Amino acid sequence: MSDLFSSESPVTLAQARTVAAGYQNVFIENLQPAGHFQIVIRDHRDHDSQLVWRNWNYESGANDALNSYLQSHGLKAS
């Protein structure tokens, strides 16, 4: 699948949870009472789990960047 998210923002929490469940290194962080959150991709080959990419769900272009980083850095869950 080339794109998991459409280019329209924001990413919903339900969408993010579905993707996070399908990848070993995708996380939802900083969940705010207003419903905003950050989608995070970390490099798990590293013992420190270094940050690869992070964006707020409502940021412009977040969907396109997330699709790109999932293709290049996403580790699918087994």
Curated annotation (Swiss-Prot):
Keywords: Plasmid. The keyword Oxidoreductase does not apply. It holds the Pfam family DUF905. It comes from the Bacteria. Belongs to the UPF0401 family. This is UPF0401 protein YubL. It comes from Salmonella typhi.
